[in-house]
Amino acid sequence: MSKINKLEHIRNIGICAHIDAGKTTTTERILYYTGKSHKIGEVHEGGATMDWMEQEQERGITITSAATTCRWQDKIINIIDTPGHVDFTIEVERSLRVLDGAVAVFDGVAGVEPQSETVWRQADKYNVPRMCFVNKMDRMGADFYRCVEMIKDRLGAKPLVIQLPVGIEESFKGIIDLVKMKAVIWKDESLGAEYFEEDIPADMKDKAEEYRAKLLDMVVELDDAIMEKYLSGEEVTEEEIKRLIRRGTISAAFYPVLCGSAFKNKGVQPLLDAVVDFLPSPIDIGIVKGMEVSTGEEKDFPISITEPFSALAFKIMNDPFVGSLTFIRIYSGKITSGSTVINTVKNKREKIGRMLLMHANNREDVKEASAGDIVALAGLKDTTTGDTLSDMDKQVILERMEFPEPVIELAVEPKSTADQEKMGLALSRLAAEDPSFRVSTDHETGQTVIKGMGELHLEIIIDRMRREFKVEANIGAPQVAYRETITKACEIDYTHKKQSGGAGQFARVKIIFEPLKEVKDLKDEDKNKTFVFESKIVGGAVPKEYIPGVEKGLNNIRETGVIAGYPMIDFKATLVDGAFHDVDSSVLAFEIAAKAAFREGMPKGNPKLLEPIMKVEVITPDEYMGDIIGDLNSRRGQIQSMDPRGNAQVVTANVPLAEMFGYVNTLRSLSQGRAQFSMIFSHYDQVPSQVADIIKAKK
């Protein structure tokens, strides 16, 4: 990390795209030409350097963002490889959070595909400046100009064409650089390492002039002095054009569009030049939002090497050689191995051991890293994704990443007792790596339940459990967590007596059960509870020491409701009277009496079955609105709102979780894969009686 590691020399970029647009191949070529990779890895042979997990090599899709450092000209480029499959959008969100700029790769044949829209919208959310690389220009049916139109129409973005392709499909051999007004042609025999500049071919002169004029019209708008010069017929210099393209890219006034064929090794070096010339350095971003721990005040912190140390942990990975690795993006200050920092989210100290610069699957030890760097730390104890590491004296919490709630759950059981312990360890490791994956235990069945972002997501988790941790497990079908409640108040007076020889048992309880929403004087601390117990015993009708027995009995018994055995929620139990016996009463006797009172009382409270209702948000192009709303209505959904966002529509609806299984596939087919959805738990609501009858029958 020599002195070229100045902030303006760093580019932290992501390469994001739809699955199969050629993103991994593009990254591979970048590594090859920047001298980090000695052999070109081909994805379709399962050998790419970036795709280093076994499943990725088999499926040919990128799952884990591996962070790689390489150099071009005198700049350091940190590349975060992002997955392109919809079930891994969490990985994309996570990497976009720590990037300064991105290259969106499009398939020259397919154009803007559905996942490209999703990733583009996520990049909008984090205000990531980006440029577009239209790839696969050598393929049959590739059409650069159609692709540019799709960027405009489908993404609602403003493309700035800075290159044109020379030759089409098989005869694609280079590009026209509209800034220099030169053609750049590659020599096939040198694996794309050698290329030369020449004059623009005569048959492309007119097109080049037309697009050059469009380019100038767009960029001069950013600078009044240059605009005047341009309008008065003076020549705008190459330097001025580059400076304006950079300014417009960083402010998202437009998105430069380049083209090439990564697989055929054409167009990669100009893409690297453009990354260096047009994408922002950490200095251009300038600030990071956060909170000062001492004051609790939200403020903007400068990105600078001279400020106190702060970094965001954005990825945790299990490395077969080093163990657990925490990838961090350093926003300010510097860090040395051996120093101690604080995790401000958990308020725990962390000692920095090994610090690694990662190159896909190779690693290089470093002793010091500073603002702008992306490094991996080995052996952190308490840090998880989204945590902030900070200087001990000036503590900050950087803006936390928001992770969507998982939308699908499955029960898993280990196949043998030997697998039991291994499975617990495997699942907790995987959950630490991936915040969109959750593990819990079902109180009713004792089963382990795993939750994730989609079927492919959970499939891959189960696959990793088998491969990396050697755990064999049986997988159940997706389930819904129903609940029960009462809808009217009732009062029960119950006496528990057992006096046949030896020590007897005696307890009398009088309990009022009522729905929580009907309780008038509910205390503030009880407002978010699903069960409230209160004792109004006066004059010692039930001695103080027996009252916890009543509460414990009710708490245990409410886990199995009276309709279909689901937990009872949203009710209050008030102990108003009772009686005891000097010899035969005990805590246990009152516990038994409370349970019996519950069983007797609940059927009188007009019990109802409840189901989880999800808040579903669907983002769709206009033309599919009708079908999507019709489908949501058929799922017992209630439409809450419809709003335009960019050139898409956002439909918000409340839909029962039970009706949402398999929705991702329905939505894909209704919208040709162009709509996307997210859902989070909203509330519990009563199940319609005809549906409740079916659920009871299944129990």
Curated annotation (Swiss-Prot):
| A GO CC term assigned to this protein in UniProt | cytoplasm
Q: Does the keyword GTP-binding apply?
A: yes
Enumerate the InterPro entries for this protein.
EF-G-like_DII, EFG_II, EFG_III, EFG_III/V, EFG_IV, EFG_V, EFG_V-like, G_TR_CS
Pfam annotation, one family? EFG_IV
The record's keywords, sorted A to Z, are: Cytoplasm, Elongation factor, GTP-binding, Nucleotide-binding, Protein biosynthesis
**Residues annotated as domain tr-type G:** 8-283
User: Where is it predominantly found?
Assistant: cytoplasm
Q: Which PROSITE patterns match?
A: G_TR_1, G_TR_2
Q: Name one GO molecular function term.
A: GTPase activity
Q: Which residues form a coiled coil?
A: none
Keyword Kinase on entry: no
Compartments where located:
Cytoplasm
**Sequence positions that bind GTP:** 17-24, 81-85, 135-138
Q: Which GO terms describe its biological process?
A: ribosome disassembly
Similarity section? Belongs to the TRAFAC class translation factor GTPase superfamily. Classic translation factor GTPase family. EF-G/EF-2 subfamily.
- Chain's role: Catalyzes the GTP-dependent ribosomal translocation step during translation elongation. During this step, the ribosome changes from the pre-translocational (PRE) to the post-translocational (POST) state as the newly formed A-site-bound peptidyl-tRNA and P-site-bound deacylated tRNA move to the P and E sites, respectively. Catalyzes the coordinated movement of the two tRNA molecules, the mRNA and conformational changes in the ribosome.
* Name of the protein: Elongation factor G
Organism, per UniProt?
Rickettsia felis (strain ATCC VR-1525 / URRWXCal2) (Rickettsia azadi)
Upper lineage ranks?
Bacteria, Pseudomonadati, Pseudomonadota, Alphaproteobacteria, Rickettsiales
Name of the encoding gene = fusA
